[in-house]
Amino acid sequence: MLLRIYYEGGYTEALESLLVSFSAYLRRRTDIGYHRANFENLIRFVRQMLRTYPLTPAAKTRIREEVAATQQVAERGWLMKQLE
């Protein structure tokens, strides 16, 4: 996924642009059902990670707990790995 490449490569401007366009795409599409919540949560968590970039230990812990408590998250495994 392009999101992973941008985040792991440190391309923050490109990642932010991708998140904005992906969010707009999700708003336009009405036929994707439950996938919308999964991807909206992914976007929300990646934005939180970007706001505190580079991640401090306290921010990692807070976001990791929030990801674990949220039921519908796309790419949960990748998010948890980034927050180790």
Describe each PLM feature range.
Residues 1, 11-84:
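C-terminal non-catalytic interaction modules
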